[in-house]
């Protein structure tokens, strides 16, 4: 089945120099994603828009968050099939990405994709975010400038899984659906508890003539 955007000039316009790497990623997930439980059967012909371009929508916000920061470190929580972590890493080769994922079969997939895409800026950790949070608290690893995620959990839970990973003045950048504003309205207490402030929703461009997505941004005190 051919992807609806295959060969479209939109891909080069949005993805730029990352396109060759992401074409290899697209081919792999189009062939293996459904049987390996990474995408649904109805996604096979819309992988570019629903998964890759949707993930790339966070790239300008990550760049903005790390502007002027020497160590541009990004943690991607619940990386799953590589959305948004692998896509963002391909688009931002000057940033160091740590993909955090608890499931072994998804860890295997991520390692395969990192090799296929020849990404030199990605580290993969098998584990839950709370284990990595403990490493940050014990100063075994440095906190991150940015934490990203997509379709992991509602903000009431996500706040505690992500905000403690951030350095002061860092940012959580989370891809969300249409209920994003309702989620942050409901999670005000949890956001504040874990050091977050100024939660807001932005409408992020996916590509020309494509439906935009929603991104939640939370600053770390």
Swiss-Prot record:
Methyltransferase listed as a keyword: yes
Keyword terms: Cytoplasm, Methyltransferase, rRNA processing, S-adenosyl-L-methionine, Transferase
Binding site for S-adenosyl-L-methionine: 78, 83, 150
GO MF term (any one): rRNA (guanine-N7-)-methyltransferase activity
InterPro entries: rRNA_ssu_MeTfrase_G, SAM-dependent_MTases_sf
Cellular compartments annotated: Cytoplasm
Location, primary (coarse class): cytoplasm
SUPFAM superfamilies linked to this entry: S-adenosyl-L-methionine-dependent methyltransferases
Gene Ontology CC annotations of this record: cytosol
EC code: 2.1.1.-
Keyword Chaperone: no
Top-level taxon of origin: Bacteria
Cited NCBIfam families: rsmG_gidB
UniProt record similarity statement: Belongs to the methyltransferase superfamily. RNA methyltransferase RsmG family.
Role of this protein: Specifically methylates the N7 position of a guanine in 16S rRNA.
Protein's name according to its UniProt entry: Ribosomal RNA small subunit methyltransferase G
Organism: Bifidobacterium longum (strain NCC 2705)
Record lineage: Bacteria, Bacillati, Actinomycetota, Actinomycetes, Bifidobacteriales
